[in-house]
Design a protein with these regions (language model features):
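C-terminal substrate-binding subdomain of Rossmann-fold SDR/epimerase-dehydratase oxidoreductases
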Residues: 191-325
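N-terminal Rossmann-like NAD(P)+-binding domain of SDR-like oxidoreductases, especially those catalyzing
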Residues: 1-172
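Amphipathic alpha-helical recognition patches that constitute DNA-binding helices
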Residues: 9, 137, 165, 187, ...
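Hydrophobic, Gly/Ser/Ala-rich alpha-helical and linker tracts in large acyl-processing enzymes
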Residues: 174-185, 194
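Short glycine-enriched, charge-decorated loop/helix-capping segments at active-site entrances
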Residues: 82-87, 178-182, 221
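The catalytic Tyr-centered alpha-helix of NAD(P)H-dependent dehydrogenases
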Residues: 124, 135-142, 181-188, 220-224
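Glycine-centered small-residue hotspots that permit tight backbone geometry or close packing
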Residues: 6, 34-36, 48, 78, ...
């Protein structure tokens, strides 16, 4: 199994879960945003970049690869708006070269880490896989374009793929040995936990007058270990000969910003001061994905779905690794 971007947050957790099932794992990562310390010791690591076809060819020629899990992409919404060409180059051009090499070496199964940002402003809540896709930023645009690359490559070359669309990955492995470590950090739960860790004095709440019960944005949070299991089930789905497919992943339950902060206060025992600030442009009031299709077809059943457990596992990582790896 080749895990591209396996030194990153979700990729490293998926690699670890694969190894726990007895799978032989090869990781390729350019370490632009990943961490060598996150690579499981039982995985074989290749440092390199998707843009380097010879690098990919070498892996496919020298390793027994029957499927690819693709996490190797830039994923910061704000950065993608400021520097869209960086995202088109890395996410699209890199994936095109990957597909060239896969087709050449007859590797016909890929599971792809997509995003619910492909939907843009949702028409319905919870969001279904059949809903309109109209991204509102270059990051979401590149992920949607990657899905279309897989679709047309499947038509032309027999590739089969699964695209997994999800929102807010969070939490950390129960061992506490790996977790979330972004620089700069942009995700809510790690930002909140920087307060009890002494890294910031308070957490900002962007907007308190949304059309939600407490006035703050509602989001769908999903434990990274549950996400990892979904990727493993998707590989199994393809290995069983099933056709290409797209699945949403989520708990189907949204939590507001205030609810997340309150739960973090309970878990950490810290007061975590919060400062109310104006809304940010483009933040929808509510984003929750329906994962009924994944539950029915993949047999996926998230088990770490309580907000308290998610934050407890994240805190277990962050309090012992305040500076990341």
């Amino acid at each position: 199994m080749l895990v591209l971007g396996g030194a990153g947050y979700i990729g490293s957790h998926t690699a670890l879960e694969l190894i726990r099932t007895g799978e032989s794992v090869i990781i390729a990562d350019n370490l632009a945003t990943g961490h060598i310390e996150a690579v499981p010791k039982d995985a074989k690591f290749y440092p390199g970049d998707l843009h380097d076809k010879a690098f990919l060819d070498n892996i496919f020629e020298n390793e027994q690869i029957d499927a690819v899990i693709h996490f190797a992409a830039y994923s910061l919404v704000g950065e993608s708006v400021v520097n869209p060409l960086k995202y088109y180059d890395n996410n699209l051009c890199g994936t095109k070269i990957l597909l060239d090499s896969m087709v050449e070496h007859h590797i016909d199964k890929i599971v792809f880490s997509s995003t619910a940002a492909t939907y843009g402003e949702p028409e319905n809540i919870p969001i279904l896989e059949t809903d309109r896709t109209q991204p509102t930023n270059p990051y979401g645009e590149t992920k949607l374009a990657m899905e279309k690359m897989f679709y047309w490559t499947s038509k032309a070359h027999g590739l089969r793929y699964v695209s997994l669309r999800y929102f807010n990955a969070c939490g950390a492995d129960k061992s506490g040995k790996i977790g979330e470590a972004h620089n700069p950090e942009s995700h809510l739960i790690p930002l909140i936990l920087q307060v009890p860790n002494g890294k910031r004095e308070s957490i900002s709440i962007y907007g308190t007058d949304y059309d939600t019960p407490d006035g703050t944005c509602i989001r769908d949070y999903i434990h990274v270990t549950d996400l990892a299991q979904a990727h493993i089930l998707a590989v199994k789905y393809l290995k069983n000969g099933n056709e290409s497919n797209i699945f949403n992943l989520g708990n189907g339950v949204g939590y507001s910003v205030k609810e997340v902060i309150d739960k973090a206060r309970k878990v950490t025992g810290h007061p975590i001061p919060a400062i109310e600030t104006p809304k940010r442009a483009g933040d929808p009031a509510r984003l929750v994905a329906s994962s009924e299709k994944a539950r029915k077809i993949l047999g996926w059943n998230p088990v770490h779905d309580s907000l308290e457990e998610i934050i407890s596992d994240a805190w277990n990582w962050h309090k012992n690794h305040p500076d990341g790896f």
